[in-house]
Amino acid sequence: MARRIRKVLKTTLLVVGEGAAEKAFIEHMKGIYAAGVFDQKVSVDAADGGSPSAMIRYIARIIGHVSYDRTVLLLDTDIPNTTRDRKAAKKQKLELIEATPWCLEGMLLEVLGQPTPATTKACKNALHAQLSGPETSKQSCKRCMSETWKSSIR
């Protein structure tokens, strides 16, 4: 009789970004931290913007069809979350990560030790100028995120 090979089940994680730039950043971070290190399958998606409630509804549709152990939403804070949004996220067992100030780009500028402009658009322009390509490509993040920055995040 042949031996059965036991399949190790991995926990699953869905990380959803507000838009294409957030998705590219999350995929870049996934490549650094999740590559064979964790016993976890990480899926990345983009909610394609909108209000926080629209993004929460988008994720609710996804997890209605596919079950994940953990679900995380990375969203900008330029449009504030309401109590209703937070309750809906809690009901879906959705963890919210709010990028402050204003957006992911502002948060990254702050982490890089650079001055943070006063508006979302200015933050995006300041960071996108430092990228090696379009902000929607995970390869573009490598130029401005040095080893020093990566080690400070760990």
Protein language model features and the residues they cover:
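Helix N-cap/beta->alpha junction signal
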Residues: 18-19
